[in-house]
């Protein structure tokens, strides 16, 4: 294994989380992003899988592996195996998907599936509780936890796709997301910025139907003196923060910019901020979460 790591092994994502949180959707998104995906491979075979990938002449450079409650008695070995591989220098990231108990119960009710850990009681809440306990050690070592409570399958797929769309560039991956406070805060955001202090195009009849990506709306929003000052100050702040986050070893940063409905002001400002960051050499993933919502 050491020989493989020294040669430069593949990028590995361990996808885990509670049942019903969206792992199947996330795995499909990873496959679309170019990962070789393996569902329900016993974690003890991970080292062998990495070893075999070293004989593919670079054809397998990104691997995604689902590790969850189906591992059974092997699940307890997962944190140890992952830690050992990391210590050998492998590029392994653990992505944990979670959701509120209420949303998980609702999802199981909609699909009428039995929870895999329901046990003799057969109830979904009992299964959820047992699974949370079984996965606690994996969640503790996760590089990122994504709460999918408020995300639909399309939003989750977009999030994962943009999160892993490229493996090159700066060590710190930056995502700028616009959103509407009406639809709740992005649960995965590291920095949240409120731009509701700006004049709202919603109240201008000729601008109301158009999103912040429309040049007319963008000109109106970005032409405001306060919008210009906001961009200058936020750019200065990020110019201070990003090098320090990199030095700390932080891999990902999500900056969320919100307005009332997530259609006009936040969209225009998020696009402008992303453009500034990219102009400074920082690759950025831009996501307008609520722009199509009413």
UniProtKB/Swiss-Prot annotation:
> Is GTP-binding included in the keywords of this UniProt record?
yes
Q: Where does GTP bind?
A: 68-71
Q: For binding ATP, which residues are annotated in this chain's numbering?
A: 17-24
What keywords does the record list, in alphabetical order?
A: ATP-binding, GTP-binding, Nucleotide-binding
Gene3D superfamilies in the record: P-loop containing nucleotide triphosphate hydrolases
A Gene Ontology molecular function term for this protein is: ATP binding
Name the InterPro entries for this protein.
P-loop_NTPase, RapZ-like, RapZ-like_N, RapZ_C
Work out whether the entry's keyword set contains Transmembrane helix: no
The entry assigns this protein to a family as follows:
Belongs to the RapZ-like family.
- What exactly does this protein do? Displays ATPase and GTPase activities.
Name it. Answer: Nucleotide-binding protein Anae109_0152
The organism of origin for this protein? Anaeromyxobacter sp. (strain Fw109-5)
